């Protein structure tokens, strides 16, 4: 809406669009408890944050909002929900058992222990933007094999519960950093899922976007929603019944898909942007908002 990627500000035109289409809300739900979050920020030596909005705001526990979104859009009645991200208020990993809509927390990791914060710190150490370009780190992890001595340095930091929220001071090649980060993440991820005793698993949180590590989930009937990160949590705040999983929740642009025109443009070695129908909801959206090009020209 603002044409700024990951804009932290809610754009005025988005609010107006919602009001024009659905009316003014009685209250607004937000996917973090700011009282608890500011307690954690104070503990970490950070300044508190506030939200200013013209409507009354009700707060929801962050990891519960993740879990609710994943469960209610899944095909399961009874299942385990695993939430792994950088950080919520205090939780960085939670595991829930859900029986017919009743959520029971089984385990949790709390700040500063966080495999998500570790991965973000490694993203920053490699020269990419933390909390945004972790997908680049994941892709880069396959480029180069790391040296075992450098792996041991980072692994020791993880084993000694280093607080990665402040970053990590290493000077390895960025592709080696990526390789080390992915290997340690996958080692810890396998330990986590090996302790799950269930056939049905819902996996949510920002770490659910690490599609390379998700190959270890084939032992379960696994459901990962289209937007497992904080965007999905906005739905998780308010949802309380099963709805069909559907990624087409964004702004609608009418018109037919211009297949013939796209083909002609590609034949002329052009790059083509296509916007048609409702935009997909989630960071891995592809289809109704796409760029096309002939990769043989690269």
Task: Report residues per predicted region.
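Short acidic/glycine-rich loops and adjacent helix/strand connectors
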Residues: 1-298
């Amino acid at each position: 809406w603002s044409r700024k990627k990951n804009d932290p500000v809610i754009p005025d035109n988005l609010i107006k669009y919602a009001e024009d289409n659905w009316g003014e809300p009685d209250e607004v739900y937000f996917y973090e408890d700011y009282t608890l979050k500011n307690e954690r920020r104070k503990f970490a030596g950070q300044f508190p944050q506030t939200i200013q909005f013209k409507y009354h705001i009700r707060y929801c526990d962050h990891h519960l909002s993740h879990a609710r979104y994943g469960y209610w859009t899944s095909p399961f009645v009874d299942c385990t929900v695993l939430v792994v991200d950088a950080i919520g208020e205090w939780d960085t990993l939670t595991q829930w058992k859900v029986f017919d809509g009743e959520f029971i927390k089984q385990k949790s990791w709390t700040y500063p222990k966080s495999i998500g914060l570790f991965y973000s710190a490694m993203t920053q150490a490699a020269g990419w933007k933390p909390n945004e370009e972790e997908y680049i780190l994941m892709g880069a992890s396959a480029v180069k094999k790391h040296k075992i001595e450098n792996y041991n340095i980072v692994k020791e930091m993880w084993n000694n519960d280093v607080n990665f929220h402040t970053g990590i001071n290493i000077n390895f090649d960025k592709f080696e950093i990526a390789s080390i980060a992915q290997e340690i993440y996958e080692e810890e991820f396998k330990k986590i899922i090996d302790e799950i005793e269930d056939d049905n698993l819902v996996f949510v949180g920002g770490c659910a976007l690490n599609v390379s590590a998700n190959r270890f989930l084939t032992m379960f009937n696994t459901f990962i929603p289209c937007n497992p990160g904080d965007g999905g949590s906005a739905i998780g705040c308010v949802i309380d019944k099963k709805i069909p999983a559907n990624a087409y929740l964004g702004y609608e642009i009418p018109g037919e898909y211009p297949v013939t025109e796209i083909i002609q443009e590609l034949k002329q070695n052009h790059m083509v942007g296509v916007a048609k129908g409702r935009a997909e909801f989630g960071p891995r959206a592809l289809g109704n908002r796409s760029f096309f090009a002939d990769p043989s020209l690269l």
